[in-house]
Amino acid sequence: ESINHGINLDRQVSLQYLYYLDQIGLSISPLSNNFLFRKIGANPFPKLFNRGLNVTLSTDDPLLFHMSDDALLEEYSVARASFDLSMTDMAEIARNSVLQSGFEEDFKRKWLGEEYAKGLTFCDELKTHVPLIRAKFRAEHLALEHMLVHLIAANKGKSVLKEMMTHFGLARDAHRNILLNNLPDLESFPEQNQL
């Protein structure tokens, strides 16, 4: 599941959070947006990417908005320069593109690895060029957010949030342990394999 553009999502924080939790893909075209909606400097792409949303780059009306023969490469080049993206960021964005694509499973396995469908940490680092530590960071934070939502739904959210606020500023592992200590009463959820 994905949508094109989605640049107004930065103004709707609660909806943005739901997109993050469900990892709904956002395919954004900064060059097109630059001409039609927002200048590159105001484009929310880097903010959405840094927050862990499933964003990728795309083209939109390449004959109108692009100057080169390879519109998608142009989008990647402009995004890298404009948003100060690292090569690891670029690899993650490209991986997201394959994940969001409508290509057949065989194609995705070729570019992401045999077990990619199990989750981000199962993508083959040698194929995606996304370091395992980055994939683990993204996957673990997503799983922790899902745990928190499950605890809130089970009416344990207040006490857990209070305990987390008490330990605010501590290492992420402290928050992870607080969530895990409160989780045994809950049913399992799909993201547990990412912890």
Model-based region annotation:
Residues E1-F37:
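Active-site core of metal-dependent hydrolases
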Residues E1-N4, K47-V55, Y76-D89:
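Structural recognition of alpha->loop->beta junctions
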Residues N4-G6, R38, F65-D69, F83-M87, ...:
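Hydrophobic alpha-helical scaffolding
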Residues D10, S27-S29, N33, I40-F49, ...:
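Hydrophobic alpha-helical bundle architecture
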Residues D10, V78, D84-Q194:
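Mid-to-C-terminal alpha-helical segments outside catalytic/metal-binding sites
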Residues V13-Y19, L36-P46, F65-V78:
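Histidine/acidic-residue-rich catalytic or RNA/ligand-binding cores of hydrolases
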Residues P30-L36, T59-P62, E75-S82:
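Short beta-alpha connecting loops at secondary-structure transitions
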Residues R51-A71:
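Short acidic/histidine-rich active-site segments
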